[in-house]
Amino acid sequence: MIRKGAALVGLVLMSPVIAQPVMVESGRVHLRGQLVNGGCAVATESQDLRVLMGQYRTNAFTGPGSFAPVSVPFSLRLISCSAEVWRHVGIAFAGVTPAEDPHVFLASGEGIGNAGIGLALFDDQQRQIIPNTLPLHYAPILTSEMTLHFTARYRAISENMTPGRIHSEVWFTLVYP
């Protein structure tokens, strides 16, 4: 009896070793990419840029459409540029826009959603950049490194602004005409 018990225990312990794997096709993964011949690459420090916008009083805005008194500068550095590939480069900015004003990016408050403020971007000539559109102006590629300068500025989009921390998520893409 002890032999049968020992044999049974041995069989149970060995069953995972001799078990055959069973494979069931459950789905597929489609991976897609793109091979591009870009004229420039984005420098590492510009790939995940954080711009500190500062602090503003709600009474600094005179109503919907009014801008904050301060423009905050920021730059995007491009490297490994080659005029042999492309002669000009532009930057397109994309992100969520508020229904009240599609010419600015949404500025969301912590836990409140729309804070009543939008974020406007401007090029180096202080021309407003319209979100989710192709660039209106392109810079010539003259050297292997170049820095494109921009400014950001808050704009009231509502009479009702909610004080608190606010943030905007904006993505950029290099565009070659």
Swiss-Prot record:
Superkingdom of origin organism: Bacteria
Give its localization.
Answer: Fimbrium
> Which cysteines in this chain are paired by disulphide bridges?
40-81
GO cellular component terms, alphabetically, are: pilus
Spell out the Gene3D superfamilies in the cross-references.
Answer: Fimbrial-type adhesion domain
Its signal peptide is 1-19
Entry keyword Nucleotidyltransferase: no
Query: Which of UniProt's keywords are assigned here?
Result: Disulfide bond, Fimbrium, Signal
For the biological process aspect of GO, one term held by this record is: cell adhesion involved in single-species biofilm formation
Q: Does the keyword Disulfide bond apply?
A: yes
Which family does the UniProt entry place this protein in? Belongs to the fimbrial protein family.
Write the protein's name.
Putative fimbrin-like protein FimI
Give the organism the record lists.
Answer: Salmonella typhi
What's the gene? fimI
